[in-house]
């Protein structure tokens, strides 16, 4: 079985459109085989975006979507917040789709290839992610701890994780090195915000 966090360029392409509306804004996302949630907007990602938009009161100027896939989180936030968003992913097909989706949705965003934070050179006010849980706990913690290391002063790391996939233990582990707050729960998913 192929994982969305790998890079199999030989996988047959079957391009498809995912149409989506939020806050009276319409979006179209190109998707394909070999990317995360290829047939529909993932519930956890949508829950993360909606929770952020309804509960966050701070203004963030530079935003990073790490492990962006075809760009749902970053593109949606860029459009609804009217902000530039940087996005990174390891999957070349996801990056190609994300570039198309930036153009289709006419947002101010960039996407580049990076194995987690390997090619990320800037620091950010907001880092937001639906991390690849299936890649294992070590990769998950690299996503989260690496994000904390790349936050500007007063910056925040927002992420979503399933209770069944260790939300409690991840929160506990992060609390050893930072403040980690549970923002919202829904259908077994937790949205958390961490800051130094």
Residue ranges and their predicted role:
Residues 162-177:
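Conserved class I S-adenosyl-L-methionine
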Residues 1-24, 34-38:
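N-terminal auxiliary segments of SAM/dcSAM-dependent transferases
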Residues 154-162:
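Conserved beta-strand signature within the Rossmann-like core of class I S-adenosyl-L-methionine
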Residues 44-120, 126-129:
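Conserved SAM/SAH cofactor-binding pocket of Class I
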Residues 125-138:
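A short SAM/SAH-binding and catalytic strip from SAM-dependent methyltransferases
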Residues 178-182:
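A short linear hydrophobic-aromatic micro-motif
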Residues 185-196:
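Core SAM-dependent methyltransferase catalytic element
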Residues 142-153:
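A short glycine-rich, Lys/Arg-flanked "PGG" loop and its adjoining helix->strand segment in the class I
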